[in-house]
Amino acid sequence: MGLTDIFLNLLLFVYPAVFIIYQIILYEISARKQINQEALKYSNLPVLSIIVPIKNEEISVIQGLLDNLSNLIWDKKKLEIIIVSDDNEDYFTKIINTVKVPKDLTVYFYRREKKLGYKSGALQYGFEKATGDLILTIDVDSRLPPNALINAYEKMQSNTCDAIVFQWNGYSSNQYSTLAKGMVVSTLFASKALFEGKEKLKLKIYPVGSGTMFSREALRVVNGWDYRLVQDDLEIGTRLIYNGKNVCASGIPIYVEVPDNFYSFYVQQTRWAMGSAEVLRNRLKYIIKSKISFTQRMDLIIYLLQYTPVIVTFFISTLLSLMLPFRIGHDPLNSPALLFWLVSLGLYASLLLSLALKLGLNLKDSLMGIGRLTAFTVSISPFIVFNFFKGLLKSGNTYVITPKGTVKKTNKLLRIIAIIGVFGLLYLLSSILYIYEGYYVTGIWLLYYSSAYLYTMLLYYKEL
């Protein structure tokens, strides 16, 4: 095996496996961290402002959030809800006239006339209107348990936190969505690993867009959100850390709605890929110059590179497909690195399956959910690549809101599926030719890789 093949195998198998094993380690460490979630009583609570950006949201969803917030344990005289709308004037008026505000809540509705940026701009607008010493950002379809706020505040006080992150627990109102079941499992797994696991290792934590409580002073120091960038949470997180602010994990759940159809999943993941790359481009200097340890800096950068294993795998798989006509003379993937990748993937899958069963899913739903999520993730690799480099090369990108509910077969969706199908057939044809030439390992690998694309092309309609 030559140096080129060694490098190829390191990128294709070892590089993604390292990311997988790192997340496994963080998840296992998070399981050892016990967090007190008993409701605490405070007689002198600060004013808390909850900022909720909305656009084209169903009124029933807005009503559901307000009803949920009215049940939270907090001095309601010291609680204000700030809803920032980017809707047109007619729909905004309809919202105000239709929503029934619970009697004990103070709710302010604002419509942005001058729409600077997207979600980041809406959060900054809300921050400028807020009067609270604490600022909580939350999506309109997220929900909190009754003791969430007061427990989070207690930890902020006891651990001297400038911001505290709630633990993402996925939910879906679509009980028939196999994708949503897989998303619920992976969301909780990632949340435990990336928040509680990192805190246990004394690594730095990024805020999340829905479910972070900030001190007003911390936001003041960094001048709030930068409306020019798409990924509001990662963007502000780098500047908070640069300014020496402490972001903590609470271990307290917030229930966030997960995508329940292919197109919503596609929009969410491609936006996150673009956003993380955009932050990498614009905020890397803040990470490098932060007065934190080398390990902490590297971990923050690795988090922003979380989509690169998908990107590297796509490039190498495509390269392998195009190499065959040149008669390479040997099996390029016949390497022990493949075994390392298989073991890491097996461990990861077993942990996801175990978590799915703990969450109450039966074995069939668990396997189907994890499998469908995996296939969809692989199949959108070309679009992850495009959007990652789009974010890396320029700022001022468009924030596309994750659509909810039933999705129609639009021309855009059909184009996406067509592109997925073309790549799937390319990898399938290449796998057959590699096997025919006697390069069995590479051929089987490409057959495996093509299956995700072909599966999505043939079955995506079941998740619409």
Curated annotation (Swiss-Prot):
CDD domains referenced in this protein's UniProt entry, alphabetically: CESA_like
One Gene Ontology cellular component: membrane
Protein name: Probable glycosyltransferase Saci_1499
GO BP term, example: biosynthetic process
Keywords: Cell membrane, DNA damage, Glycosyltransferase, Membrane, Transferase, Transmembrane, Transmembrane helix
Residues spanning the membrane: 6-26, 300-320, 337-357, 373-393, 416-436, 439-459
Membrane topology note: Multi-pass membrane protein
Organism: Sulfolobus acidocaldarius (strain ATCC 33909 / DSM 639 / JCM 8929 / NBRC 15157 / NCIMB 11770)
Family listed: Belongs to the glycosyltransferase 2 family.
